């Protein structure tokens, strides 16, 4: 009698790979940003390897710009021995008709990510983010702690997420234009008085989104 192989339960993640890659032109004139190579491998392969090493085995990739090229890459990579042995599955969320951005992209892929179970958590990772973050530790510590958990950093940029002292998300700001978006009037009042270079002011903290989050 043969031995039946068993695989771990499906652990889902989404790679955002639909972007136009305008900041990487002219490289993205002939290929999607996801397939631009860094250190001898496409960006998307770096992200995939990091996800798989953290135990993610069911990957959804959204596609728009040069979508056919990404789909062909995905079909080929899962047939290589490393990924085939780990029973890695890659499916695609088709945005050829319209680039749906972050919220729209997640909503469009929801059925693939949750199997119509709203309690099913998943990780979202931008294709152009390379980091040393331990994704398995992030998943374990953050799972069930909130409706969404975002990886942020304290660095200089133009657009920031606004957090309160307990690191709850309370708004967004573009410091180059002065625009503030928040449902809380106090956030508008306090941050309108913020010194230009202050990322921590009174009860609020400005942090840059790092392109990785758990939903």
Q: Language-model segments: what does each one mean?
A:
Residues 130-215:
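Conserved core of the sugar-phosphate nucleotidyltransferase
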Residues 2-15, 23, 37, 41-126, ...:
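Conserved N-terminal catalytic core of the sugar/cofactor nucleotidyltransferase
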